Amino acid sequence: MQDQQQVIHKAQPWHGKVGLIYGQRQGKTEMQRCFTQAPFRIQRPFYPEGNRVCHTVLLHTAGGIVGGDRLSLDLELKPESHVFLTTAAANKIYRTNGETAQQDGIIHQAPGSILEYFPQEMIIFDGAEYHQSLRVNLAPGAVWCGWEVLRFGRTARGEKFISGNWRGLTEIWQDDELLWGDRQWLPGHPEVFAAWNGLNNQPVVGSLALVGLEISEAQMAELRQTMATIQQGLGGITQLPKGVLCRYRGPSSTEVKRWFISLWQNWRSLYSPQPPTLSRVWQTY
């Protein structure tokens, strides 16, 4: 395995890109433009919920991200389009080869558009150096819903994230107003991994946010009741000026995804008449 990982680290870095444009025509959301550059690929869109919601699966064919990789995602949703975007498998961030891996995303959503962005979990190897950023520009009436699930260290191997750095920045803007900003830095260190205000010896953290619409106190109370269903780990729910933010810290990526899916199923009706349908790549949840 050591030799295999050394080979991975010596490979040439990727400069991958994804560019997608969606539009709605006669009640059907269509992928109107698709540009990919290796290692990314896009599966053919499918419609398990009917024509209104376009399900899209993003593939990273290299199997993981290494130091020096530069990856970018550019999405545009035209008025009234509704897109459900996920990934085919968990992503891996390998131990650094001396360089930092970078992934950046920019999303533009027109009035009335809906994006549900639910990538599968990211596994950050001990010693990884990784930076990511995401900026979402929402027009009035647009809704963004997304999650991030991170596992720090290969837990099954007894590995902890005690060296390296993980940095992330997410910003959701509307009419030059920052609706939600989330800047995080988790340095790999034994004290940070163990500290109660760090990972508290829990390798999995997750964030789920719904941004772009008002959430009433009654709706917030209903959402908070779902925290009682968490069997492993801790959850928290915070009301945003135009949305809601949910956090998890615990031992199980399966547990956090089950909780996040239940929240999404609960609030889907707030912005779409379409009953939620689980993605076919989520069959194990």
From Swiss-Prot:
Q: Which Pfam families match?
A: UreD
Q: Where in the cell is it found?
A: Cytoplasm
Chief localization: cytoplasm
Q: Does the keyword Transmembrane helix apply?
A: no
Recorded GO cellular component terms are: cytoplasm
Alphabetically sorted, this entry's keywords are: Chaperone, Cytoplasm, Nickel insertion
Annotated GO MF terms? nickel cation binding
PANTHER family annotated for this entry?
UREASE ACCESSORY PROTEIN D
The record describes its quaternary structure and partners as:
UreD, UreF and UreG form a complex that acts as a GTP-hydrolysis-dependent molecular chaperone, activating the urease apoprotein by helping to assemble the nickel containing metallocenter of UreC. The UreE protein probably delivers the nickel.
Tell me its family.
Answer: Belongs to the UreD family.
What role is this protein assigned? Required for maturation of urease via the functional incorporation of the urease nickel metallocenter.
Descriptive protein name:
Urease accessory protein UreD
